[in-house]
Amino acid sequence: MASFSEAPPGNPKAGEKIFKTKCAQCHTVDKGAGHKQGPNLNGLFGRQSGTTPGYSYSTANKNMAVIWEENTLYDYLLNPKKYIPGTKMVFPGLKKPQERADLISYLKEATS
C-alpha cells in the first residue's frame, strides 16, 4: 500500500463529489451541525479518533487514539474496518489512491 506521501495531488472539487455520494448520508462537515449516523467531521484534522463531543463511538474507535491527519486518513479510508477493527463505520473504503487524495483535499478545506 502506498503512503500519503506517494499519493497523487488531491482535487477538492472531485473530493466534494465523492463526499456527497459516499459520505454525506452518514456525515456532515458543517460547523455547529448535529451528528448523523456518523459524527460531524468539522474540525477533523488534528483531532484524536473517538473524541467528537456528543457522538457515541465504538470502544475500538476510542481506544485506537489515532490523530486524524492526511497520512492517517489516507490509510484509514482504504479500509476502515481493517484500520480500526471493531469500528461502527460500515463504509468499505476507497481503493483508488486518487479518490482518497481527492476526498482528503476536500475534507482539509471543508472541515477547517
Curated annotation (Swiss-Prot):
Keywords for the protein's UniProt record, in alphabetical order: Acetylation, Electron transport, Heme, Iron, Metal-binding, Methylation, Mitochondrion, Respiratory chain, Transport
PTM remark: Binds 1 heme c group covalently per subunit.
Cited Pfam families: Cytochrom_C
Compartments in which it is found: Mitochondrion intermembrane space
An example Gene Ontology molecular-function term: heme binding
Keyword Mitochondrion appears in the UniProt entry: yes
Location of N6,N6,N6-trimethyllysine modifications: K81, K95
InterPro entries: Cyt_c-like_dom, Cyt_c-like_dom_sf, Cyt_c_1A/1B
Main localization (coarse): mitochondrion
Gene3D superfamilies, alphabetized: Cytochrome c-like domain
Homology family: Belongs to the cytochrome c family.
Function: Electron carrier protein. The oxidized form of the cytochrome c heme group can accept an electron from the heme group of the cytochrome c1 subunit of cytochrome reductase. Cytochrome c then transfers this electron to the cytochrome oxidase complex, the final protein carrier in the mitochondrial electron-transport chain.
Name of the protein: Cytochrome c
Native source species: Oryza sativa subsp. japonica (Rice)
Gene: CC-1
